[in-house]
A protein has these predicted regions:
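Short beta-strand segments at enzyme active-site cores
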Residues: 15-28, 78-83, 159-162
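Short, basic, glycine/proline-bearing loop/turn elements
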Residues: 1, 128-136, 170-179
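Short, catalytically relevant binding-site loops at active-site mouths
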Residues: 88, 165-168, 189
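Alpha-helix C-terminal capping segments
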Residues: 8-12, 61-71, 191-195
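Short acidic, glycine/serine/threonine-rich loops at helix termini
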Residues: 27-32, 91-97, 171-174
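Gly/Ser/Thr-rich active-site loops/lids in small-molecule metabolic enzymes
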Residues: 2, 43, 151, 174-195
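N-terminal glycine-/serine-/threonine-rich phosphate-binding loop
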Residues: 1-17, 29-35, 151-155
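Ligand-binding beta-strand-loop-alpha-helix segment within the catalytic cores
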Residues: 36-159
Length: 195
């Protein structure tokens, strides 16, 4: 339905660059990793890895949906998904006060146990639904592959980028490394439009 709603923009010749959320999906990925850790002793993956997984899977679904809508309308346009890193400041104050809830709800006991095992920080849900892991939600500074986004868009491609707000990375020793955080999808999409 969303792809159909955007079809008029495509027909008008607009260049579409799409961002998307991943809230429920990244929570599901975290549960999959947790189950793998408990049942098979597989390593649990960090938040940046989980965001990259959801960028790929949700982007794939958006591509399928858009290609179907385009084909029905007789429009020949490519749809491409980019795994996108978004730079954040390592000194962002949100790293000292994580507040963004992610993943499932836990009992207080289970949250304490999980915290002991992993070092994760939990906060009680204000509505009394349980305890949830919280992570920092720093401000996005730069879209790392913005030049590729621009180039693909200018060539007429529909570009899916900054999924889930982008993979949060910081610059360290001249290269980028992922961090345990989530970026607001609306802020990342706005930054994409500005850059």
């Amino acid at each position: 339905e969303t792809c159909e709603a955007l079809l008029d923009f495509v027909k008008r010749g607009d260049h579409l660059i799409l961002g998307h959320g991943n809230g429920p999906q990244v929570g599901n990925v975290m549960l999959q990793h947790e189950a793998g850790m408990k049942v098979f002793e597989l390593p649990s993956m960090p938040m940046d890895f989980c965001v990259s997984e959801t960028q790929g899977s949700i982007g794939y679904l958006i591509e399928l949906g858009f290609k179907k809508v385009l084909a029905k309308s007789g429009i020949n346009r490519n749809v491409v998904t980019l795994i996108t890193e978004v730079v954040v400041d390592k000194d962002d104050p949100m790293f000292k006060n994580p507040t963004k809830p992610v993943g499932p709800y836990y009992s207080e006991h289970d949250a304490e146990e999980y915290s002991k095992q992993t070092g994760a920080i939990f906060r009680e849900d204000p509505r009394g639904r349980g305890w949830r892991k919280v992570v920092p939600s720093p401000q996005p500074i730069k879209i790392n592959n913005i030049e590729i986004v621009k180039s693909l868009s200018e060539q007429g491609n529909i570009v899916v980028t900054v999924g889930g707000g982008g993979i949060p990375v910081i610059e360290k020793d001249g290269y980028f490394t992922g961090v345990e955080a989530v970026i607001d999808k609306d802020l990342a999409s706005s930054l994409t439009a500005i850059q």
